């Protein structure tokens, strides 16, 4: 209590030490280099991140691809912010992975953002490297930003996968 440096609010972007620790974590567990100064932002929870990303990348009227089933916050925040929700279906028949043939047939004009969620909630479907590779290629082909929400990856899978392991992913994720 007697040290003035122990009081006050943390920097909005988190302390450099925390961001550096997060970058080391990503390197250790996913073998992905992230710049702690420009590519790491500590958050108080997923909803804050979903809001920040949507506000930064989408305007009212823009379209957002949302998995069905998926985390309800993707839909609710986009609706509040005036975006159009375009659902893409996930099916147990293909392991809860996106149906890329169906996605390619959709009207993608005006789509700015695509939410993915692996391990998938609520289904528990696990990520596959091939899915991440196809998502990156899809995003580049259609100029869409992919945001992969990666919850529970240490609980539901022993394989450590990140979409950022795919070459070129940082260009569209």
Language-model-derived ranges and their functions:
Residues 1-45, 52:
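N-terminal small-domain helix-loop-helix segment of the aminotransferase-like
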Residues 56-78:
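Conserved PLP-anchoring active-site segment centered on the Schiff-base-forming lysine
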Residues 62, 83, 141-145, 169-171:
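A short helix->loop->beta-strand "cap" motif at the edges of active sites that frequently abuts
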Residues 80-86:
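A short helix-loop-beta submotif of the ANL/AMP-binding
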Residues 86, 90-161:
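Active-site phosphate-binding strand-loop segment of PLP-dependent enzymes
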């Amino acid at each position: 209590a007697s040290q003035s440096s122990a009081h006050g609010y943390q920097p909005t972007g988190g302390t450099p030490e925390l961001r550096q620790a997060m970058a080391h974590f990503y390197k250790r567990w996913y073998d992905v280099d992230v710049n702690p100064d420009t590519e790491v932002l500590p958050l108080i929870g997923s909803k804050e991140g979903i809001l920040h990303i949507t506000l930064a990348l989408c305007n009212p009227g823009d379209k957002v691809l949302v998995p069905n089933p998926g985390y309800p916050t993707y839909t609710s925040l986009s609706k509040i912010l005036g975006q159009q929700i375009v659902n893409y279906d996930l099916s147990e028949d293909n392991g809860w992975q996106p149906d890329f043939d169906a996605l390619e047939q959709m009207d993608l004009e005006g789509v700015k953002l695509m939410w993915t969620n692996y391990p998938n909630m609520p289904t528990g479907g696990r990520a596959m490297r091939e899915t991440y590779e196809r998502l990156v290629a899809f995003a580049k082909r259609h100029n869409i930003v992919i945001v992969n929400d990666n919850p529970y990856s240490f609980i539901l899978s022993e394989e450590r996968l990140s979409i950022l392991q795919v070459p070129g992913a940082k260009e569209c994720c």
